Amino acid sequence: MEYMDVKRAAEVWLLSERRITALCRNGRIVGAKKSGKTWMIPDDTKKPLDGRTREYASANEQDASVAHTTTRYTTEGATGKVVDAFENTYLRAPEHVAFTPYRICPIGAHSDHNLGKITGFAINKGIHIAYGPKQNGVIEIASLQFPKRAQWHVASTPSVKQDDWADHLRGATIALNKRYPLRTGLCAIVDGELPIGGLSSSAAVIITFLSALSHMNGIKLTERELIDISMEAENQYVGVSCGKLDQSCEVYCRKGHLLYLDTKDDTYELIPQHPSMKPYKIAIFFSGIERTLAGSAFNMRVDEARSAAYALKALAGLPYGKFNETNLRDVPREIFEQYKDKLPKSWAKRAEHWYTEFDRVQKGAEAWRRGDIEAYGKLSFESGRSSIYNWETGSPELKKLYDIMTETDGIYGGRFSGAGFKGCCMALIDPAYEDAIKEKVTREYLAAFPHLEGKYSVHICESADGVKLI
């Protein structure tokens, strides 16, 4: 049998020598043998299929001559990046890669925490986690966005926040362990494709991690369980009073469909793109300023909306029960109209946004159903305006982006994406105007905020399916 050394294999396979050495050391290349300081690999070892994919031969642990299985991953883009990082960190190939898309919500913002309705999409950018098992129950995970590797045990996860990037994942471990006994840990690398802020990267990383951890423990979670456990981690451990908009979009969504969800009873519909609808793409305009949701005024806005509901019930003589179980969905619109002048101004504004957004969501779903993307886009612009004047969010940067979008040809509609304090704006655009839109928005935005050049960015995306194992 003829052999080639690691250097030659690297040239032939277009892989790094370090990666090939790691694969040999961990028995991932059948027939490889140590020779001095290098490894020798059989010449007939299966090579990459093409420039986009590669294969790793996994030898049977007891007998390397037994027929092997293969794990294939893309070598380009985000999947290849996280796989490379895993191999360079743990000196072996990952067993699996999980992916959860980011989400956008053109209409329905700030509604879910008061049991409103929402519309949304998943997009074809998101969070990847490359992972493999650790039989000792330890979770060891590193992020390509943050320094310092995090580590804890599935049976003794810290019960309080550690105030670092991995808190979302600790909370997810605790929430999952309440429902199912966890014995197997994992080693993992997590990577996000876009800057942080406005696309629900926090929910996406939790869902991706839960998919990986449950998979390693032989647990098959339903879509509803995945949403509920993810939301519990963010609410109870991280301390963010979010609803289920983010998680639902990232789990339920399907490419080419609009998610129409009622967060009161969790019923939803995936409305397909009408055959006569004009073409569209999704543009993400990052302001260049990132934000941390739990440290923002997000929770205060949620409390103000709930306070409005509680006060309206009291003013109308309705049973109002516990404060944390009160929501605007249980208060008829006519009661709000009758008593809104008696509410503190900020409370009335929060409620005004919620009720008008509820109407916009229903109108938007019908517009999408009949293929009228221009009407849907107009409602998204109205949603953005209400977020500024009634929900009272929006940094100077996001407000400027919003104003530019409303005056740009080829943009059907858009608004802040996410909480609306920093982060990004999203827009539904006519692909025929893509280049002109990018040029105009970029030029006018950087003219207003020249110090953000190099931080501001534009990304053109498409709708996508929800969470999946690759």
Question: Which ranges hold each PLM region?
Answer:
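Major-groove DNA-recognition helix of helix-turn-helix-type DNA-binding domains
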Residues: 14-40
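Alpha/beta catalytic cores of group-transfer enzymes, especially the acyltransferase/condensing modules
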Residues: 220-268, 417, 460, 464-465
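Phosphate-handling active-site elements
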Residues: 178-187, 213-229, 431-444, 448-452
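Polyanion-binding surface elements
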Residues: 1-19
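Beta-strand segments within the central parallel beta-sheet cores of soluble alpha/beta enzyme folds
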Residues: 140-142, 185-192, 221-234, 377-382, ...
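C-terminal nucleotide
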Residues: 65-103, 107, 128-162, 257-415, ...
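A short, Lys/Arg-enriched interface patch at domain edges and termini
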Residues: 43-68
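DPxDG-like acidic metal-binding loop motif
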Residues: 122, 199-219, 426-430
